[in-house]
Amino acid sequence: MDDRAYDVLAMGRCGIDLYSNDVGVPFEQIRSFAAYVGGCPTNVSVGTRRLGLRSALLTGVGDDPVGDFVLHFLRQEGVETSFVPRKPGRRTGAVALGIEPPDRFPLVFYRENAADLALDLDDVLRAPVERSRVLFLTGTGLCADPSRTATLFAAERAAAAGT
């Protein structure tokens, strides 16, 4: 029996996804959006928790209302948020998506000064990498430092621990 604290530790992007409520219209004609929490690792942490796994998330949020929105949602879903630091001076990311079936889904990312890209080595040292059965990583964290170094360090720790 594996006695690790978490089944899945997901690391990387989180934010607010704004999906068009007006399906089939050009982006410039959208009248309203619905707000959801998003980011691949964030979605994985929620999905695995809904499947009954012990799920934790390692990401960063800004000290802003969007960060509050993300944390509130994750806590309601039962995802462990102890490893989601607030990053002062940074913003929680956002994306706006249009829906133009069958094959157009225009999107605009707002990632300037994104909090999740401020994850650093100290954040990884505080995270339960060795106490997780799986470390789930995505490529977004590799796009810039300090998150690039932190992501590679997390991968090294996981490999050394047999995660």
Give the role of each language-model region:
Residues 83-92:
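A short, structured active-site edge motif that brings together acidic residues
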Residues 46, 94-98:
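Short beta-strand scaffold segments in enzyme catalytic cores
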Residues 1-80, 103, 119-121:
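Glycine-rich phosphate/adenosyl-contacting loop at the front of the ribokinase-like
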Residues 67-68, 92-94:
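Short Asp/Glu-rich motifs
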Residues 1-10, 73, 101-163:
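Ribokinase/PfkB-type carbohydrate-kinase core domain
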Residues 85-86, 97-105:
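Active-site phosphate-binding/coordination module
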